UniProtKB/Swiss-Prot annotation:
It comes from Thiobacillus denitrificans (strain ATCC 25259 / T1). Its main location: cytoplasm. ATP binds at residues 30-33, 51, 87-91, 415, 495. Belongs to the chaperonin (HSP60) family. InterPro entries: Chaperonin_Cpn60_CS, Cpn60/GroEL, Cpn60/GroEL/TCP-1, GroEL-like_apical_dom_sf, GROEL-like_equatorial_sf, TCP-1-like_intermed_sf. The gene is groEL. This is Chaperonin GroEL. The lineage of its organism: Bacteria, Pseudomonadati, Pseudomonadota, Betaproteobacteria, Nitrosomonadales. Disulfide bonds: none annotated.
Length: 547
C-alpha cells in the first residue's frame, strides 16, 4: 500500500481552499451577459471555446493532490446543480467559493465550525423560503423566451426558438438539440406520435411524390406477435372492408402469405392497408404498443390477456385522424384515445422516470412521454465553424434546461437581484449562539457575490452597483447587458427559481462540509527509479555492417 500524506487543521484547510479558488476563479469569469470565454485544450482537433461553467469545471484537474480534493468538491457543486436544475453552475460555484473563504476566516479566528455550519443552514433555509414567496409562475411565451435568452448568455434568438418549440409541442413535450447544416438556427416539429419503423413493403406507398403511405381516418390493429397466416387476419379484414376505412397493422412482424395478401388487396384497391413492425424490443415493445393503444383508443391484441387475432372486433381497433408511413418512420396524428387515459399514462411514466437509475432508461421513458404528450421538436443549431457549433449547442442545451426549470417552479428577478431581496429574511434569523450568528453573516455576504461578479465581468465597480441595488426594492436591479438600472422583470432579465434555489443549497452543502473538515489524507507522489542505462556494446552495433 502506498504511503499517505496526512494533514491536519489549518495546514489541510489552506491547501483545500487553494484548490477551491483555482477552480472557482476559472469558472466565474464566464458569469453574466458580458462573461468572458474560456478556451479548453483538446488532445486532437481544435480547442473548445465555452462560456459554460460546468464545462470549465469538468476540465480542471490539479497536480497537487490536496488542492485537487478542494477543486473536486467544488466541481461537485457545479455538476449537481447542472443535473438538478440544468443551469446555474457558475452561480453555485461563486456562492460556494464565497462561503468557504468567509467561513475559513471565522474558523481561523477560533469559532466552532459545527455552529458556523448550523448558522449557514438556517440562513439558507430562510432565503429558500423567501425565494418561493418572490417567485412568479412562468406561463407566457415571452417569459420563456426571456429566461432562455438570459441562460444562453443574452442570445435572444436562442430564447425565441426555445419558446417557439414549447408553443408547438407543449411544456411537457420533448425538445432535442442537434447540429444544423446552415448558418441559421432551425426548428423542426413532428406532431403526434412518431416511431422509427417504416412500411414492410414499398407496394403500400400511395403517395408517389412523398414516397409515403398516407391514410386518413384509419383503423389501427395492434398485435404483439408475428402474423404469417392470413386466416388469422381474415375476420378483421372483412369487418374493416365493410366499414370502408383503411387499416394500419402494427405487429412484431408481418410476412409470408399474410404480407402478400395485404399487398395484393392494396394494389387492387380492395382494401387500403399498410403494415409496420412494432418499435422497440422485449418489454419496451410491449410498453410502446400499450402507449399506442391508449393514444388511439384501441386494445393490444395479446394472448397474455386472453385476446386472439381471429376473435378481434372493430371495438378492439384504435382510430386516428391520419397516419403517415415513410421508409423509416411512422407518424400517428390525432389519435382517438381518451384524454384522461392519456394523462394517466403520462403520470405513470413520470413515476417510472423518478424511480429508474439508468440514464438510458430515463431517456427512453422521456421519449415515450413526449410521444404521448403531443410531439417532438428538434432545434438544429446553425454556425459557421465546428468550434462555434459546439459552443452554441452547449448554450442552447443550457437555455433549454433553464426554461424547463422556470416552467416547473416559476421565475424570480435575474442578475443576482433575487438573492439580495431575500437578504432581509436571512438577516432576521437569530442563531442559538454567537458562532451561529457568524454563520448567518457568512451567507449574507456570499449572496452579494453573484451580482459582484457579474458587474466585475462588465468592467464596472461592484460595490457601487451592489449598494445602489440594495437601496432599491422589489424588482429593481442592474441590467449588466445594457449597463442600466431598472425593473429586471420589465427588462426581461429573469432567472428560474429552481436554478437560484438549487445553486444556493448545493453551494452551502459542500461549503459546510469543507468548513467542518479537520484532516485530509492523500497518496504521496512516488519517486520513480531512473531507467536502466543501455548495456555495453549495444551503442552503435558497429560489427553489424555489410561486407
Amino acid at each position: 500500500m502506498a504511503a499517505k500524506d496526512v494533514r491536519f487543521g489549518d495546514s489541510a484547510r489552506h491547501r483545500m481552499v487553494a484548490g477551491v479558488n483555482v477552480l472557482a476563479d476559472a469558472v466565474k469569469v464566464t458569469l453574466g451577459p458580458k462573461g468572458r470565454n474560456v478556451v479548453l485544450d483538446r488532445s486532437f482537433g481544435a480547442p473548445t471555446v465555452t462560456k459554460d461553467g460546468v464545462s470549465v469545471a469538468k476540465e480542471i484537474e490539479l497536480k497537487d493532490k490536496l488542492e485537487n480534493m478542494g477543486a473536486q468538491m467544488v466541481k461537485e457543486v457545479a455538476s449537481k446543480t447542472s443535473d438538478v436544475a440544468g443551469d446555474g453552475t457558475t452561480t453555485a460555484t461563486v456562492l460556494a467559493q464565497s462561503i468557504v473563504n468567509e467561513g475559513m476566516k471565522f474558523v481561523a479566528a477560533g469559532m466552532n465550525p459545527m455552529d458556523l455550519k448550523r448558522g449557514i443552514d438556517k440562513a439558507v433555509n430562510a432565503i429558500t423560503e423567501e425565494l418561493k414567496k418572490i417567485s412568479k409562475p412562468c406561463t407566457t411565451s415571452k417569459e420563456i423566451a426571456q429566461v432562455g435568452s438570459i441562460s444562453a448568455n443574452s442570445d435572444a434568438p436562442i430564447g425565441q426558438i426555445i419558446a417557439d418549440a414549447m408553443d408547438k409541442v407543449g411544456k411537457e413535450g420533448v425538445i432535442t438539440v442537434e447540429d444544423g447544416s446552415g448558418l441559421e438556427n432551425e426548428l423542426d416539429v413532428v406532431e403526434g406520435m412518431q416511431f422509427d419503423r417504416g412500411y414492410l413493403s414499398p407496394y403500400f406507398i400511395n403517395n408517389a411524390d412523398k414516397q409515403m403511405a398516407i391514410m386518413d381516418d384509419p383503423f389501427i390493429l395492434l398485435f404483439d406477435k408475428k402474423i404469417s397466416n392470413i386466416r388469422d387476419l381474415l375476420p378483421v379484414l372483412e369487418q374493416v372492408a365493410k366499414a370502408g376505412k383503411p387499416l394500419m397493422i402494427v405487429a412484431e412482424d408481418v410476412d409470408g402469405e399474410a404480407l402478400a395478401t395485404l399487398v395484393v388487396n392494396n394494389i387492387r384497391g380492395i382494401l387500403k392497408t399498410c403494415a409496420v413492425k412494432a418499435p422497440g424490443f422485449g418489454d419496451r415493445r410491449k410498453a410502446m404498443l400499450e402507449d399506442m393503444a391508449i393514444l388511439t383508443g384501441g386494445t393490444v391484441i395479446a394472448e397474455e390477456v386472453g385476446l386472439s387475432l381471429e376473435k378481434a372486433t372493430l371495438q378492439d381497433l384504435g382510430r386516428a385522424k391520419r397516419i403517415e408511413v415513410g421508409k423509416e418512420n411512422t407518424t400517428i396524428i390525432d389519435g382517438a384515445g381518451d384524454g384522461n387515459a392519456i394523462k394517466g399514462r403520462i403520470a405513470q411514466i413520470n413515476k417510472q422516470i423518478e424511480e429508474v437509475t439508468s440514464d438510458y432508461d430515463k431517456e427512453k421513458l422521456q421519449e415515450r412521454k413526449a410521444k404521448l404528450a403531443g410531439g417532438v421538436a428538434v432545434i438544429k443549431v446553425g454556425a459557421a465553424t465546428e468550434v462555434e457549433m459546439k459552443e452554441k449547442k452547449a448554450r442552447v442545451e443550457d437555455a433549454l434546461h433553464a426554461t424547463r426549470a422556470a416552467v416547473e417552479e416559476g421565475i424570480v428577478p435575474g442578475g443576482g437581484v433575487a438573492l439580495l431581496r431575500a437578504k432581509a429574511a436571512a438577516a432576521a434569523i437569530k442563531g442559538d449562539n454567537h458562532d451561529q450568528d457568524a454563520g448567518v453573516k457568512i451567507v449574507l455576504r456570499a449572496i452579494e457575490e453573484p451580482l459582484r461578479q457579474i458587474v466585475k465581468n462588465c468592467g464596472d465597480e461592484p460595490s457601487v452597483v451592489v449598494n445602489k441595488v440594495l437601496e432599491g426594492e422589489g424588482n429593481f436591479g442592474y441590467n449588466a447587458g445594457t449597463s442600466e438600472y431598472g425593473d429586471m422583470v420589465a427588462m426581461g432579465v429573469l432567472d428560474p427559481t429552481k436554478v437560484t434555489r438549487t445553486a444556493l443549497q448545493n453551494a452551502a452543502s459542500i461549503a459546510g462540509l469543507m468548513l467542518t473538515t479537520d484532516c485530509m489524507v492523500a497518496d504521496l507522489p512516488e519517486d520513480k527509479a531512473p531507467a536502466m542505462p543501455m548495456g555495453g556494446g549495444m551503442g552503435d552495433m558497429g560489427g553489424m555492417g555489410m561486407m
